[in-house]
Design a protein with these regions (language model features):
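Residue-level structural signal for beta-strand termini and adjacent loop
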Residues: 87, 102, 118-120
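A solvent-exposed, acidic/Ser-Thr-rich amphipathic alpha-helical stretch
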Residues: 26-79
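Low-complexity, intrinsically disordered terminal/linker segments enriched in charged
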Residues: 114-131
Length: 131
């Protein structure tokens, strides 16, 4: 298999959530996150250099010695991957959280170039009973 094959948008986002976060593999940031990356939040757009992305994620993982995400729902359209996720966190203070959120990723040439997200909410997404 070609080691230089560009990952699909789904593969990039899965690696970002399942390996970078869950396995705390910050060494993968250069392979997954573009330089720069645009982060969208309600009322705000921020441009982060790769170094700023590394710093942001390092600080988050230091604050949360336990941090795990699972994908509850994923929708893909071309370069766009939307993920409804469940998360579990324990901070250095000992306080634990169950949370959920939705993020939209735009992936170009195997790297995340944009992320849209809003604040996470308390509680977990529940499995759909309609499928």
């Amino acid at each position: 298999m070609d080691q230089h094959k560009v990952k699909t948008p789904v593969e990039v986002v899965e690696t970002y959530l399942d390996i970078l976060y869950n396995q705390r593999r910050l060494d993968l940031i250069p392979d997954l996150i573009a330089d720069p990356t645009w982060r969208h939040a309600p009322g705000k757009i921020s441009q982060l250099t790769r170094q700023e992305s590394i710093q942001r994620l390092t600080e988050l993982l230091e604050l949360c010695p336990v941090l795990r995400f699972e994908t509850a729902v994923r929708v893909v359209e071309g370069a766009m991957v939307t993920v409804a996720w469940n998360g579990w966190s324990t901070q250095t203070s000992g306080k634990s959280y169950e949370m959920s959120g939705i993020e939209i990723f735009r992936v170009v040439d195997g790297k995340i170039v944009e992320i849209w997200n809003s604040r996470e909410a308390a509680g977990l997404w529940q499995p759909s009973k309609t499928f």
